Every structure is written in C-alpha cells, then in structure tokens.
Amino acid sequence: MNKEQLEKMKNGKGFIAALDQSGGSTPKALKEYGVNEDQYSNEDEMFQLVHDMRTRVVTSPSFSPDKILGAILFEQTMDREVEGKYTADYLADKGVVPFLKVDKGLAEEQNGVQLMKPIDNLDSLLDRANERHIFGTKMRSNILELNEQGIKDVVEQQFEVAKQIIAKGLVPIIEPEVNINAKDKAEIEKVLKAELKKGLDSLNADQLVMLKLTIPTEANLYKDLAEHPNVVRIVVLSGGYSREKANELLKDNAELIASFSRALASDLRAGQSKEEFDKALGDAVESIYDASVNKN
C-alpha cells in the first residue's frame, strides 16, 4: 500500500470523483453527455467514446489534485491509456489516488435488498489492479427496504469480500447504498450503522477500509464510524439527488466528503468547446469541494 496515497485519503481536503459507470450504465452516461446510441455500432466503440469522455475529464485543468483526492475507475478504463500512460499511473502522477470498481452488478432483490452478484474473477482482477498501481477498490450493494436480515446480509457480504481485497494489499470502499426514496430511510440507516460497526469491530488493527454511504437523513449519524480506527474515510454518493441538493445535505455532515458521479458530470457535453467544458467541470468541482470541506 502506498503510504503517501493513504495519508492523502485519510487527511486530504477534497473529494473523490466517481468515473466508474460500467457496461450497463454507459449508454445512459453517454446520452447525458450528448452522445446518442446511433453514434456507435458496438460495445468497443461505445467504450472508446466513454474513455474519450473520461480522458477529457481527467486531463482538464479543472480536474485538480488540490480539490480531487481520488478517482474511481471502471475495469475497462484501468486497462486503457491517457496521454500514453495507463489511466491509474496518469492519475497518480497528477496526484489523484486511483480506485477500481470491482463488483459485477446487483443480484435480484431479496429481503428488501440487492446483494452483489458473485465476483468470480476477484483474485485475478486484484492482481491486475496491483500491476496497474491501483490503491483501492469499490463495490456496491443496494438497500431498498427496512429488513434487518437483508441489511445484515448486505454488510456481511461486503466485509467478507473486503477482507479478500485487504489481503491483496488494497483498500476497499464498502458501498451499501440506501435508496433515497426508501420509506423508512432514517430507520434503515440506524440498522445499517449498527451492522457496519459490528463489521468494523471484526477487523484486525491493520485491516483498513473506506465506506461509501447515502447521505443520512439524520445529520452526523455516521460521525463515530468516521472516527473508527479501521476507517480511512467515509465518502457519500449523490444517489439521485441533484448536485445542489446533495451538496446542501453534505454540508450538514461534518466528517463526510463526496464521491459523486452523475452530480459531477451532469453539466458536461460532448459539443462543448474546451473553455466551456473546463468551466462546467470547474464549477462542479468547486461546488462539490466546497460541500466536502466547508461545513455548516
């Protein structure tokens, strides 16, 4: 593990850019960017277009390591190059810590939750991540209803996989998303917090994780989890809120920083000039940084 990157993730001021839309969500991400499905005829062309978009983001002067601590990549992006370097090396050289999305998507809903599908190639994927100088990973589950068994299952699965990731020398981001429209959201979050605490308490002193959570209904609910010795940092997802709303809610949570995807890229368009693109990205970065650093 790179100690300098660990220090940056633990104490740096800023947020994490989530650039990890995978195969399923790529057409939607491209459409929002202004690239329609008739502009590519197969998956390779689609992934090249999305890589071009991500390249435009990470090479922009607005994508500044003074504001952006890390970036989460999709497997395809890890294996591609930006300006002649593998993406993770390009980011690390720029001062941005690289993470890799490792999950294979969500299973069918059961007990009010969606567990992760089995990650059958996890070992070899983590070996490749190490070869590509990736610092950490990210994997997402989804909680839709107040169901204690379901929430327990989500957290247990996350920690089980997290321990395999830690064993390979990487720092896992555990992401049990709570749907922002869930009927008993505040109650779900209390149960989730208790289960996360159990999981964290089961780790050895040298087993470090990060958490990526939905912004809690009760402000500062996760404060003591953020202070847990095994937690490097807690980041939050925008989860369907507009950027303005997500930023507003984030400002009320002292220990949390953003890890936004859609809310970061929502004003970026393929047809923008370099100046327009850099300004739109810069405005987004500035506002998300502000919400991550300057608290109410």
From Swiss-Prot:
Pathway: Carbohydrate degradation; glycolysis; D-glyceraldehyde 3-phosphate and glycerone phosphate from D-glucose: step 4/4. One of its GO terms (biological process) is glycolytic process. InterPro entries: Aldolase_TIM, FBA_I, FBA_I_Gram+-type. Its EC number is 4.1.2.13. Pfam families: Glycolytic (PF00274). It comes from the Bacteria. Keywords: Glycolysis, Lyase, Schiff base. The active site is at E175, K212. It is an enzyme of class 4 (lyase). Gene3D superfamilies: Aldolase class I. GO terms for molecular function: fructose-bisphosphate aldolase activity. It catalyses: beta-D-fructose 1,6-bisphosphate = D-glyceraldehyde 3-phosphate + dihydroxyacetone phosphate. Belongs to the class I fructose-bisphosphate aldolase family. This is Fructose-bisphosphate aldolase class 1. It comes from Staphylococcus aureus (strain MRSA252). The lineage of its organism: Bacteria, Bacillati, Bacillota, Bacilli, Bacillales.
